[in-house]
């Protein structure tokens, strides 16, 4: 169904390698980092770099296409040029470790398109995962004030998913807060690190 997936668990990457070996296929992955939104991704940046190296060296059927981030979702952490520069710097660390350039540095989803729209997306980000902005067109208009996308429909799909990973992460988002994935400005209570 797809040739590239977002990954943030070593166990899942190993299982993917086994299945690719069984099917005699190669699958591309974007390894995710968490830059404060507390959604998916490696929280520990050294661990992310180590995992990227292990994918590169130890998983011949899993191709490390790049790294990525998700922002303005669970934790409502705003996509900013600073957050994107943090991702680009992390990509450079991975590239130095694996000895080649990454094909993909994925700067987020629809909410990150605002940086492109306003001309503030830093160089080095070469990929966005724009789904809602294309399929619904609501968030950019209603939540981010971009009005030139009103030709898009807002009733095109229903998404159902299974929870496939749980991690220990802080309960308070890191970075400048904006809106969450539902257009709300939630308040957070810092309860320390929790399994989620």
Give the ranges of each region predicted by the language model.
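Active-site-proximal beta-alpha core segment in soluble small-molecule metabolic enzymes
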Residues: 1-101
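Active-site anion/phosphate-binding pocket segments in diverse small-molecule metabolic enzymes
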Residues: 83-196
């Amino acid at each position: 169904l797809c040739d590239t997936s977002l990954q943030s668990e070593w166990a899942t990457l190993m299982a993917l390698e086994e299945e690719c070996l069984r099917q005699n296929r190669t699958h591309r992955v974007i390894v995710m980092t968490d830059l404060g939104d507390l959604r998916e991704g490696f929280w520990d940046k050294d661990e992310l770099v180590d995992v990227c190296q292990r994918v590169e060296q130890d998983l011949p059927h899993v191709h490390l296409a790049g790294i990525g981030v998700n922002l303005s979702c669970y934790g409502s952490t705003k996509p900013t040029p600073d957050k994107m520069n943090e991702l680009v710097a992390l990509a450079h660390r991975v590239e130095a470790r694996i000895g080649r350039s990454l094909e993909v540095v994925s700067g987020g989803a629809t909410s990150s398109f605002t940086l492109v729209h306003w001309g503030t997306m830093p160089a080095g980000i070469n990929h966005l995962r724009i789904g809602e902005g294309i399929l619904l067109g609501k968030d950019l208009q209603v939540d981010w004030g971009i009005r030139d996308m009103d030709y898009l429909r807002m009733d095109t799909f229903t998404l159902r998913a299974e929870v496939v990973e749980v991690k220990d992460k802080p309960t308070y988002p890191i970075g400048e807060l904006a809106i969450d994935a539902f257009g709300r400005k939630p308040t957070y209570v810092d309860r320390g690190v929790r399994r989620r």
